[in-house]
């Protein structure tokens, strides 16, 4: 990294920081909390063993809907008409392409489109339950900042209910791959821990240069000049790559280049893992079911539009700075893992 490289890196960081501060204000409010929780979870659970064997069972469309309907009944019967609607009005799509499209929900001209990449096992059930949670929370609504932040909490909650139902009905882990929730959580944490220091250093101390290594060592961990340079170089190359891919997509599709959209794509290396960590942790946490249903119904409505993340955590009776919170997280992850081990 030469002087010009650091100037370029800081320009990227400045754009990302300004974007996040304006559009994702809760990120910085709880950044340190999520980092400390992430460190604790990673140190406590990174050595968990997961069996990678996976089987297919040619689960039919009818089988998938049957199981998802039972899962939704377990959460709240009032959502069954919504489930039937997505089937009858063409909002549910199963992708059979060899090239994966991904599992996702999106609002499209008043419709709430759910796409599921077929795995041909009970992951199809779990994935549909997850995306259906997004559907209920978002269809026909303008997503608020709070709704964006907590969206994965709702999806993960529905996913965990699906896993619990399938395990209780005697299905084995090689059909469920329910361990993916913990594996993805640990992956998100690994990336978050890796990316967190640069944005938090820029947030507190401003421009990054080689001298910033001393502050890095003071607040994070010891690192020599070569490794610090390499860390910064990796981020610079990643931002360059994201920019290059975005410009290529715009060129190939005759899209107008939108600078704010480009910065949003770059910002996701900090915000996406944050959202998935927070969402998974809350979904695993022992919460009052009625409070969760209220969030599903109202997260993106006027009822919650003036609430902050602090208000939501208070409503859920959560103090993320407390030892009780950490203990409950440990217990929740351990209990989830034990339930998986029973069906391996």
Question: How would you label these PLM feature ranges?
Answer:
Residues 128, 132-136, 154, 278:
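Active-site His/Glu-centered metal-binding helix of metallohydrolases
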């Amino acid at each position: 990294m030469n002087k010009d490289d650091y100037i370029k890196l800081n320009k990227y960081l400045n754009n990302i920081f300004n974007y996040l501060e304006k559009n994702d204000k809760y990120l910085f409010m709880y950044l340190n909390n999520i980092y400390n929780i992430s460190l604790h979870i990673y140190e406590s659970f990174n050595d968990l063993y997961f069996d990678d064997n996976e089987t297919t069972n040619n689960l039919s469309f009818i089988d998938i809907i049957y199981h998802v309907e039972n899962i939704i009944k377990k959460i709240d019967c009032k959502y069954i008409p919504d489930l039937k609607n997505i089937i009858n009005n063409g909002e549910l799509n199963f992708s059979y392409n060899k090239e994966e499209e991904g599992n996702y929900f999106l609002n499209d001209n008043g419709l709430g489109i759910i796409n599921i990449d077929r795995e041909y096992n009970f992951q199809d059930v779990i994935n549909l339950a997850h995306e259906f949670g997004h559907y209920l929370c978002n269809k026909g609504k303008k997503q608020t900042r709070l709704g964006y932040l907590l969206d994965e909490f709702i999806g993960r909650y529905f996913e965990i209910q699906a896993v619990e139902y399938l395990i209780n009905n005697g299905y084995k882990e090689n059909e469920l791959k329910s361990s993916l929730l913990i594996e993805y959580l640990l992956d998100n944490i690994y990336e978050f821990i890796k990316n967190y220091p640069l944005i938090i250093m820029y947030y507190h101390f401003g421009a990054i240069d080689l001298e910033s290594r001393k502050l890095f060592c003071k607040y994070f961990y010891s690192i020599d000049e070569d490794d610090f340079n390499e860390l910064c170089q990796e981020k610079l190359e990643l931002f360059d790559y994201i920019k290059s891919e975005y410009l290529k997509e715009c060129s190939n599709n005759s899209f107008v280049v939108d600078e704010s959209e480009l910065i949003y794509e770059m910002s996701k290396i900090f915000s996406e893992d944050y959202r998935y960590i927070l969402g998974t942790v809350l979904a695993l946490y022992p919460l009052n079911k009625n409070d969760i249903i209220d969030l599903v119904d109202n997260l993106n409505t006027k009822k919650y539009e003036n609430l902050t993340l602090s208000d939501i955590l208070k409503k859920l009776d959560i103090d993320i700075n407390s030892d009780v919170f950490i203990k409950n997280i440990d217990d929740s992850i351990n209990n989830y893992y034990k339930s998986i081990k029973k069906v391996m």
